[in-house]
Amino acid sequence: MTEHAPPRRPRRARRRRIVLVAALAGALLGGYALGSAKAAPIGHWRSTEGRAAYLEAYDTAFADLPEPADTHDVRTDYGVVRVYRFAGDGDAELPLVLLPGTASGMPVLADNLPSLLEVGDVYAMDLLGEPGRSIQDRPITSDADKAAWLHQALEALPEDRFHLLGLSIGGWTATNLALHHDEHLASLITLDAIQTYDDIPLGTVARSIPAAFPWMPKAWRDSFSSYTAGGASVEDVPVATMIESGMQNYRMAQPQPTRITPEQLATLEQPVLAILAGRSVMHDPEEAAATARSTLSDARVEVFPDASHAINGEYPEEIAALVDDFTTEVEAR
C-alpha cells in the first residue's frame, strides 16, 4: 500500500472538491431509499419543468468538457445509455471507460478528463436509472440487472477490452460488473469506491438524513456536502448546479448497492487499482485499504491521506499519473 503526501492545491481545487460530494452523499444515502420505496418502477423526472432545468444545467456543465469525438446512445434491455468518446493523446492501447458517482451525470468528471486524455482515449457514460441523458425504460431490481445494462453498453462499443474506472458508486458499479460479466475488462480502477471495501459508517448515514429529501432547504444539503468534502465550502459552479438539479428533479427507483463482500472481492481476477481517500467519511479508510490489500489477488492500493471523498477534484493530475502507470504495466503483461 502506498500513501501520497498531499501537494499544496490552489483555491480552485477547493472549489472543485465539493461538486462531487452532493452527487454521492445525500443522493446515495437518501435518493436510493426514497426511490425504491415510493417511486414508479423506473427512475423518472418529477416534472417536465424539472427535466428541462436539469438538462439546461447539464449542458452548461458539459460546455467545460473537451469536445467529444463521438456520442453514442446505446440500446440495452434496461434502457438507452448515453456514452461519449473523447480522443486522447496518450499511448494506451485500450481505452478508459469512466463511470461517475450517483445523481451527478458524467460532467462531474470534467476536472479529470484533461489529464486522463493524456493517457489515451476515454469513454464516459451517464449511469442508467440516474439523472443524466441515459433513459431507463425497464425496472432495475438487482445487482445482476445493474451489471447487465453496463455489460450490454460495453458490448456495443467497437473495442473489445477496456480499463474500467469508477468514481464512488461508479467504483461499486465497476466492481459489480466484474463479478457478473468480466469478459471485456482488462483492468479495474476504483476511486474511493463505496460499499466495496467497507460499509458506509452509521454516523455518515445519520448525518445524511436531513439532506435526503428534495423539499428540505438547500443549506442542509450543502452542510452535509461540506462534511463529506472535508469542510470545503459549497460554491455555485456549473457541475454543482447540475447535481443539485438532479437531486431535486429526478426520482431514482432501484435498490441501494449491496455491500460487496470480501469473499466476492477474492474472486476477482482482473488487475485492480484501488485509490482511497484518507479522510473519506463514506467508509473507514484504513479498514477499506486493509480489505483491498488482503482480498484482491492482483491489486495496487494507493491512499491519499489528506483527500476527502471528493478526491477526484482534489487530485486529478495525481490520479491520472497513477492510472497511466497502472494501465501501462497491465498492457505490458
Report the location of each language-model feature.
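Conserved alpha/beta-hydrolase catalytic His-Asp/Glu region
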Residues: 199-205, 213-269
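Alpha/beta-hydrolase fold catalytic core
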Residues: 2-94, 119-120, 328-333
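Conserved loop-alpha-helix segment in the C-terminal half of the alpha/beta-hydrolase fold
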Residues: 273-307
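Gly/Ala-rich beta-loop-alpha elbow adjacent to hydrolase catalytic centers
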Residues: 166, 170, 174
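Active-site loop/oxyanion-hole signature of alpha/beta-hydrolase fold enzymes
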Residues: 124-165
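Flexible "cap/lid" loop of the alpha/beta hydrolase fold
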Residues: 175-179, 187-215
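Conserved HGGG/HGGXW glycine-rich cap/lid loop of the alpha/beta-hydrolase fold
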Residues: 54, 82-132
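Catalytic active-site module of serine/aspartate enzymes centered on a nucleophile-bearing elbow/loop
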Residues: 299-333
